[in-house]
Amino acid sequence: MTLISRRGFGGLFGASALGLAMPSLAFGAVPKVVVIGGGAGGATAARYLAKDSKGALDVTLVEASKRYYTCFYSNLYIGGFRKYGSIGHNYYGLAVNNRINVVHEWAASVDGAAKTVNLASGGKLSYDKLVLSPGIALKYDSIAGYSPQAQGRMPHGWTSGTQAQQIRNQVLTMKKGGTFVMVPPPNPYRCPPGPYERASMIAHLLKERNPTAKIIVLDPKEKFSKMGLFTAGWEKHYPGMIEWLGPDAHGGIKSVNHETMEIVTDLDTFKADAACVVPAQRAGSIATAAGVTDGDWAPIIPATMASKADPNIHVLGD
């Protein structure tokens, strides 16, 4: 993993890296940078573009939500180590302290030829450079039976929002000795250790409140991130509570049924009292709308994070 310092990040996304010509400032034109997506990546990019350029860039952040709940630390909330409010953040300080224009609207599409972002309200934002931090979109149809409706009883909790609360509440209300079933996503996906961190935090909660309960992880993968560390930790802290089953053991995930709370594999059917089902993923929809995707993801030039499809668009995130 390559670690980028704050100074390095600012250099990576500085005016020169974005290809913005500073001589134009002599004629009074301030280059415009629009950032779409106010999650960790987009908000950080907007902050340091504005801060490190010292007014040389006109930075606008487009984010539909007025409050952002982080996916990271949501597992600590589920486990009882943090309050839900602690993972929520508004954009007031970001806007005021860094002189960023924050627009709380949906970005509907991007016209790369005209260098324009089209807002759902009908408004338009012009740019010299565009930074996309699109997050992820869920491929619900990657698991038969899973859908936006199914997530009401089998939440994924893989995008910011209230589903972390839903998962915690379902765990707290499980019957004594009940079964929690987790279905992690196939590669590639956001935060590779995340499903196993979540299983650990749910085990911590159950150990305190429902110690005879069981967690079954039905994994489509043969191995997972930091597998040795997680399995050793489970055996040490939650012996006998977490059972991880790979495809060799279950034969493959066939379908889920949110009404009966059943997960069907090739070799068996698992009945859950509570469940977390995380489907396959792709780049967020705005990346497709901007024309920078190839299949599910958005190829970039690593040195500058510029899109291979459009040199005036930089893509970052998961």
Annotate the PLM regions.
Residues 13, 134-135, 279-280:
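Glycine-rich, N-terminal phosphate-binding loop of Rossmann-like dinucleotide-binding domains
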Residues 119, 132-133, 182, 277-278:
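Redox-cofactor binding/interface segments in oxidoreductases and associated redox assembly factors
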Residues 134-209:
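Glycine-rich dinucleotide-binding loop and its adjacent helix/turn
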Residues 148-176, 270-318:
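FAD-site-proximal beta/loop scaffold in flavoenzymes
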Residues 27-101, 186-228:
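Beta1-alpha1 glycine-rich phosphate/pyrophosphate-binding loop at the start
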Residues 97-109, 114-117, 125, 204-299:
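A Rossmann-like FAD-binding core segment of flavoenzymes
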Residues 1-17:
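N-terminal secretory signal peptides and thylakoid transit peptides that target proteins
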Residues 15, 24-26:
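Cleavable N-terminal signal peptides
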